[in-house]
């Protein structure tokens, strides 16, 4: 089985940051990316379990995968158009 998290185009380590900083950093990073590129987000703020999926829905990015059972949390998104 392929680890979806193993080959992202970009990686953002947001560990140690608290709401709203992780989502602000994701938004800033996504702005520099090309459509279709992927971003691995590593975070430990419990609020990201709600905020990252909500950000993806609101901004029309695809949340490809998420692991939130244990710290650090990992999210993989693909930039939309």
From Swiss-Prot:
The active site is at residue 19. GO terms for molecular function: sulfur carrier activity. GO terms for cellular component: cytoplasm. Pfam families: TusA (PF01206). Pathway: tRNA modification. InterPro entries: Sulphur_carrier_TusA (IPR022931), TusA-like (IPR001455), TusA-like_sf (IPR036868). It is found in: Cytoplasm. One of its GO terms (biological process) is tRNA wobble position uridine thiolation. Keywords: Cytoplasm, tRNA processing. HAMAP family: Thiourid_synth_A. PANTHER family: SULFUR CARRIER PROTEIN TUSA, SULFUR CARRIER PROTEIN YEDF-RELATED. Interacts with IscS. Belongs to the sulfur carrier protein TusA family. Sulfur carrier protein involved in sulfur trafficking in the cell. Part of a sulfur-relay system required for 2-thiolation during synthesis of 2-thiouridine of the modified wobble base 5-methylaminomethyl-2-thiouridine (mnm(5)s(2)U) in tRNA. Interacts with IscS and stimulates its cysteine desulfurase activity. Accepts an activated sulfur from IscS, which is then transferred to TusD, and thus determines the direction of sulfur flow from IscS to 2-thiouridine formation. Also appears to be involved in sulfur transfer for the biosynthesis of molybdopterin. This is Sulfur carrier protein TusA.
């Amino acid at each position: 089985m392929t680890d979806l998290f193993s080959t992202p185009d970009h990686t953002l380590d947001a560990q140690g940051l608290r709401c709203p900083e992780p989502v602000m950093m994701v938004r800033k990073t996504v702005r520099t990316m090309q459509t279709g590129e992927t971003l691995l987000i590593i975070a430990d703020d419990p609020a990201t379990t709600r905020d990252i999926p909500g950000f993806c829905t609101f901004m029309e990015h695809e949340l490809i995968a998420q692991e939130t059972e244990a710290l650090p949390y990992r999210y993989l998104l693909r930039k939309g158009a």
